[in-house]
C-alpha cells in the first residue's frame, strides 16, 4: 500500500521551496505520496518559521493535535523542521515527546536516513547542524509544477540585524556554485517553466563558485539565467540595500527578462531606528538606490518590509517612515508589529510603545500603502501588459488568469492552449484584488529573446562520474 506524507508549511518562500524538495526527496527514496489530509498520513512533517511572535506556541498547538493522531496510530512518524526546530532543538522533544525527527533548514536532505533510523530503532533523532551547502548535493532532480518555479541560490545571512533570527536558525551566507543553479534552471526550462524566482535570505550577497574556480557575482548570475531559452521572466527574493550595487542596477538596463518589480526591505524610514536595527544604511541611501533603479528602469515598482513599533520608536520616527512611504510610493508591503525574537539583541531593548499605539501605526501604514497600490493599478488601465498565463480564472472557469510583472492578477478571455505561455493584454478594468484585460497578442506574435537552449546549458553544466553517467548535483 502506498505510504502517505503530509507537510504543513509556515513562513517564507524559502520554506515553501524546502517543503517541495522534501516531498520530492521522500517520494524518490521511500515512495511517499503527498496528501492534504493529516489523518491519512504515515509521515507528518511540520516546516516551521520563527520570524513572528508566538511561533513556538503555534508549533506546539499543532503538535498537540498530531499527538492524538499518533495515539490512534503508533506507527505514525512525526517530524519538525525549519527555523523553530533549529532554535529549539532537543528542547522541542522535551515539550512534545510525540516528535520523532527534528531537523534544521540545512539538514532536510538527511530526512531519508533519519526516517530509517526511527523505523529501525524506534528511537528519536535530532540533527540541526549547519553542514554548509551539502543539502543541495543530495536532492532529487527538480520537478516543474506549472510555468513558474522557485530556485534557491544561497542560504543564510551575515547581516545580524538586531531583530532577526535568520543568522541563528539558517546559518551564515553560503552560495551554491553557479553551474549547479544553471543546471537546475535549465532542467526546469526543459519541462516548460517560463519564470524563475531566485531565492535566498540576501540574494544580492550571492558569490558562487564557477567551474573554473572563479567567482560568479549576483549580477552575472542574473544575466546567465536570463540567457536560458524559455526563461523569459526572472525574479528574486529577497535583498538587502547595502549590497544592492551598481552592477545589479545595470542588469535592469540591459536584461528585459528581469521583471520591473523589486522587493527591497527597508524596515523603517527613521535613521535612528535603522541604526538600532543595525541595518547599516540610512533612509537617504535607500532612496538613492531607488532613484538609480528608476533611472535604469523607469516603470519599476517597489515593494518593501516594514516593522512598526520597534522598541523606542517615537511618533517622529513613525512619521519619518510615512514620509519614506510617500516619497518612494511603494506598491505593496509586508508590514508587521515588532515582536521580540528570543536570542536577538533587540529582545533586550526596553519597549515603551503601547500595543494600542503599535496597532494604530500599523493600520495607518497599511492603509496608505493599499491606497498607493490601488493608484498604481488604476494607472495600468489602458496600458498593455505582458501576462504569464497560469491557468483558468478562479472567478470564471471559462476564462484564463495570469500575472503581470508587478504581480497583478489579470483575468481575460482566452483558449486553454495559452496556459503556460505569455500573452499581451490591454487592461480595461480594476478590481480590489485583480485586473480585467482584453487579449491583444499571443506568444507566437512576440519577439522573445533566444540565446542558449536548456539542453545546451544542461550539457555544459552536467556532472558525470568516472564511467560517463550524468550525476545531478544542484
Swiss-Prot record:
Residues 143-375 form the Radical SAM core domain. InterPro entries: Elp3/MiaA/NifB-like_rSAM (IPR006638), Methylthiotransferase (IPR005839), Methylthiotransferase_CS (IPR020612), Methylthiotransferase_N (IPR013848), Methylthiotransferase_N_sf (IPR038135), MiaB_methiolase (IPR006463), rSAM (IPR007197), rSAM_horseshoe (IPR023404). It is found in: Cytoplasm. Its cofactor is [4Fe-4S] cluster. SUPFAM superfamilies: Radical SAM enzymes. The keyword Transferase applies. [4Fe-4S] cluster 2 binds at residues 157, 161, 164. Belongs to the methylthiotransferase family. MiaB subfamily. This is tRNA-2-methylthio-N(6)-dimethylallyladenosine synthase. The gene is miaB.
Amino acid at each position: 500500500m502506498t505510504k502517505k506524507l503530509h507537510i504543513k508549511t509556515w513562513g517564507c518562500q524559502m520554506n515553501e521551496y524546502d517543503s517541495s524538495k522534501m516531498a520530492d526527496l521522500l517520494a524518490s527514496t521511500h515512495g511517499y505520496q503527498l496528501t492534504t489530509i493529516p489523518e491519512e498520513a504515515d509521515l507528518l512533517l511540520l516546516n516551521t518559521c520563527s520570524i513572528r511572535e508566538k511561533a513556538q506556541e503555534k508549533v506546539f498547538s499543532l503538535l498537540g493535535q498530531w499527538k492524538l493522531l499518533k495515539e490512534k496510530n503508533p506507527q505514525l512518524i512525526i517530524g519538525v523542521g525549519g527555523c523553530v526546530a533549529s532554535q529549539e532543538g532537543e528542547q522541542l522533544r522535551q515539550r512534545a515527546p510525540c516528535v520523532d525527527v527534528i531537523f534544521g533548514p540545512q539538514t532536510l536532505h538527511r530526512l531519508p536516513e533519519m526516517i530509517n533510523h526511527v523505523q529501525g530503532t524506534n528511537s528519536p533523532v535530532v540533527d540541526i547542524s549547519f553542514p554548509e551547502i551539502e543539502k543541495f548535493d543530495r536532492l532529487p532532480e527538480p520537478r516543474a509544477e506549472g510555468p513558474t518555479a522557485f530556485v534557491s541560490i544561497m542560504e543564510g545571512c551575515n547581516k545580524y540585524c538586531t531583530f532577526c533570527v535568520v543568522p541563528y536558525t539558517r546559518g551564515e551566507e553560503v552560495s551554491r556554485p553557479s553551474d549547479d543553479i544553471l543546471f537546475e534552471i535549465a532542467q526546469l526550462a526543459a519541462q516548460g517553466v517560463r519564470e524563475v524566482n531566485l531565492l535566498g535570505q540576501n540574494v544580492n550577497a550571492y558569490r558562487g563558485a564557477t567551474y573554473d574556480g572563479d567567482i560568479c557575482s549576483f549580477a552575472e548570475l542574473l544575466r546567465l539565467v536570463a540567457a536560458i531559452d524559455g526563461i523569459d521572466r526572472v525574479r528574486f527574493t529577497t535583498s538587502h540595500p547595502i549590497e544592492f550595487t551598481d552592477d545589479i542596477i545595470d542588469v535592469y538596463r540591459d536584461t528585459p527578462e528581469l521583471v520591473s518589480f523589486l522587493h527591497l526591505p527597508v524596515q523603517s524610514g527613521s535613521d535612528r531606528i535603522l541604526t538600532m536595527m543595525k541595518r547599516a544604511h540610512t533612509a537617504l541611501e535607500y532612496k538613492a538606490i531607488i532613484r538609480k533603479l528608476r533611472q535604469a528602469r523607469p516603470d519599476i515598482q517597489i515593494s518593501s518590509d516594514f516593522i512598526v513599533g520597534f522598541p523606542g520608536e517615537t511618533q517622529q520616527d513613525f512619521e519619518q517612515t510615512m514620509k519614506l512611504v510617500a516619497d518612494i510610493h511603494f506598491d505593496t508591503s509586508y508590514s508587521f508589529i515588532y515582536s521580540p525574537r528570543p536570542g536577538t539583541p533587540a529582545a533586550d531593548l526596553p519597549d515603551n510603545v503601547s500595543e494600542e499605539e503599535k496597532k494604530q501605526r500599523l493600520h495607518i501604514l497599511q492603509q496608505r500603502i493599499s491606497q498607493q497600490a490601488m493608484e498604481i493599478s488604476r494607472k495600468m488601465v489602458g496600458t498593455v501588459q505582458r501576462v504569464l498565463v497560469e491557468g483558468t480564472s478562479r472567478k470564471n472557469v471559462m476564462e484564463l488568469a495570469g500575472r503581470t510583472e508587478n504581480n497583478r492578477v489579470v483575468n481575460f478571455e482566452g483558449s486553454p492552449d495559452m496556459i503556460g505561455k505569455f500573452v499581451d493584454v490591454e487592461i480595461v478594468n480594476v478590481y480590489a484584488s485583480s485586473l480585467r484585460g482584453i487579449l491583444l497578442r499571443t506568444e507566437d506574435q512576440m519577439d522573445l529573446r533566444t540565446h542558449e537552449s536548456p539542453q545546451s546549458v544542461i550539457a555544459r553544466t552536467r556532472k558525470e562520474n568516472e564511467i560517463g553517467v550524468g550525476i545531478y548535483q544542484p
